[in-house]
């Protein structure tokens, strides 16, 4: 047996509790929710957080293992990006949330076309910024580019994603909002 050094990635304790039954139940329910929905109308979104963590350390693990996780409550955040795409491979413009009180012009100097840029104190998406993403990027795309019929939006189950405003708009526009299990 040989071992190799890897940097562990951080995972929150509640994410480490996900069971096989949780995953099987999710996919059983998802199958029913996708019935009658065109692939062009099925979307998945996810936030990616880019960090500057000078405290990362290597650990010993088996060769061939691409990554190793370690359970930690917090990480130092720089900015977050929300990505969203359809089941047919259409990518919506991203939204970038910087950790700052004010937006600096230089951050948008080479902006991605139709991307949205915002700030929060933490650099994470919150209810306000998620609503902006939903209205300006996702709902805008649904209204202007999707086929008739039901739509599905699949993503994280963070509390800030479930504002009354977003839920009302999902109902109004025939969008089935499906939360992933903690992962």
Label each PLM-derived region with a short phrase.
Residues 1-183:
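Phosphate-facing sequence motifs and polybasic nucleic-acid/acidic-lipid-binding regions
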